[in-house]
Swiss-Prot record:
Signal peptide: none annotated. The gene is hemL. It comes from Saccharophagus degradans (strain 2-40 / ATCC 43961 / DSM 17024). It comes from the Bacteria. Homodimer. Keywords: Cytoplasm, Isomerase, Porphyrin biosynthesis, Pyridoxal phosphate. The modification N6-(pyridoxal phosphate)lysine is found at residue 262. This is Glutamate-1-semialdehyde 2,1-aminomutase. Coiled coil: none annotated.
Length: 423
């Protein structure tokens, strides 16, 4: 065991501050990172890795972008946190509302978990209903209401997926199969008048990378509208990754509430939830639904977010990045086929994922669970040795940044070829 990991385990549970970082899913010990720049991570031994985790999505410009660092450095001179309104909060809020379809107002928080938790509380308060629908394999943070897995039948209420989550909360959560349109219609036919909201990752990035099938998001929109339920698109991951307007712009489906995070914070701890004036004015202090946060709207985080979003508004930003994502994902699939290894890839926007399976298309959680995870683990460690860092779990999406060059893609494809020859 490395000294760094041994030291960490003495004072931090499991040696990490988020479980996936511990490498338990893939085996071995986590890599401790010292610095990062552009598309590269450097560990404490100064080994360089081409990074496709990108801090789990936020670093769409690449690590330590000069403009973002300059904005943060400038803002730091005036203080770290005030606990009072600042003009930069309004500046970023206005920009996001002008970008995201149907968003009139937005509330900043400090994490994606806070954003989804608050969005659900708002939906329940606004509708006067308690039940929510979520989808198996979608992750919306670690709040109690959302750590619920599917029950024994399609429409049974869920059961807690973690000790410490009261069973009474599970009674209000219905967990359905992602991309199952008929199941959604059945649920609304049976209990539509009890449903406060549906929350969904428009592209499921926490069971690797699963785009919605044609008609799935549209059905959610239609059923919510008919039942008077709110549709929450959890764009913490997809926001600004499928284009400037996120998944809702990419797929043309307008939610009632959007949650954001990751990219929007430029690498700082930021989350947000927003929607129409009518819905958002139901939040305190204008409305009865309480939500608050000591560090919400932190000025340094706002500066990082504003600097990031301003660069994303460049009309030429996304096209080359989408093309590189396609080249990388399809290139790895081609190499796997040449090596006789069953592999399917999904990609959309700047997100991508690989599945070691005979299936030609992977569209739901059950298919993801049936993949060859031991082979993925070997692939992960092989790439790590080659100097390529992908997510240390087969259920997590990969990402690209504007800092990744054609040479980085070529390097990665050669690394994948080398690994396929060994596994």
């Amino acid at each position: 065991m490395s000294q760094a990991f041994e030291n960490a385990q003495q004072y931090i549970p499991g040696g990490v501050n988020s479980p996936v970082r511990a490498f338990k899913a893939v085996g071995g010990e986590p890599v401790f990172i010292k610095r990062a720049k552009g598309a590269y991570l450097y560990d404490i031994n100064d080994k360089r890795y081409v990074d496709y985790v990108l801090s789990w999505g936020p670093m769409i410009l690449g690590h330590a972008d000069d403009d973002v660092l300059a904005a943060v450095t400038e803002k730091l001179q005036y203080g770290l946190s005030f606990g009072a309104p600042t003009e930069i909060e309004t500046e970023l809020a206005k920009k996001i509302c002008n970008i995201m379809p149907g968003m009139d107002k937005v509330r900043f928080v400090s994490s994606g978990t806070e954003a989804t938790m608050s969005a659900i509380r708002l939906a329940r308060g606004y509708t006067g209903r308690d039940k929510i629908i979520k989808f198996e394999g979608c992750y919306h943070g670690h709040s109690d209401s959302l750590l619920i897995k599917a029950g024994s039948g399609a429409l049974t209420f869920g059961v807690p997926s973690s000790p410490g989550v009261p069973a009474c909360l599970a009674e209000h959560t219905v967990t359905l199969t992602y991309n199952n349109i008929e199941q959604v219609k059945q649920a609304f036919a049976e209990i539509g008048d009890q449903i406060a909201c549906v929350i969904v990752e428009p592209v499921a990035g926490n069971m690797n990378c699963i785009p919605p099938i044609a008609g799935f998001l549209e059905t959610l929109r239609e059923e919510c509208t008919k039942a008077g339920s709110l549709l929450i698109l959890d764009e913490v991951m997809t926001g600004f990754r499928l284009g400037i307007t996120g998944a809702q712009g990419y797929y043309g489906v307008q939610p009632d509430i959007t949650t954001l995070g990751k990219v929007m914070g430029g690498g700082m701890p930021v989350g947000a939830f927003g929607g129409s004036k009518e819905v958002m004015d139901y939040i305190a202090p204008t409305g009865p639904v309480y939500q608050a946060g000591t560090l919400s709207g932190n000025p340094v985080a706002m500066a990082a977010g504003l600097a990031t979003v301003q660069k994303l508004e460049n009309p030429d930003f996304y096209a080359p990045l989408f093309a590189k994502t396609k080249t990388l994902c399809e290139g790895i699939q081609t190499l796997a086929k040449e090596a006789g290894i069953p592999l399917t890839g999904n990609y959309v926007g700047t997100m991508w994922g690989l599945f070691f399976t005979e299936e030609e298309k992977v569209t739901n959680y059950q298919q993801v669970m049936a993949c060859d995870i031991p082979r993925f683990n070997k692939f992960f460690h092989g790439l790590l040795e080659e100097g390529v860092y992908i997510a240390p779990a087969s259920y997590e999406a990969g990402f690209l940044s504007a800092a990744h060059t054609d040479a980085d893609i070529d390097f990665t494809l050669q690394a994948a070829k080398n690994v396929f020859a060994r596994i």
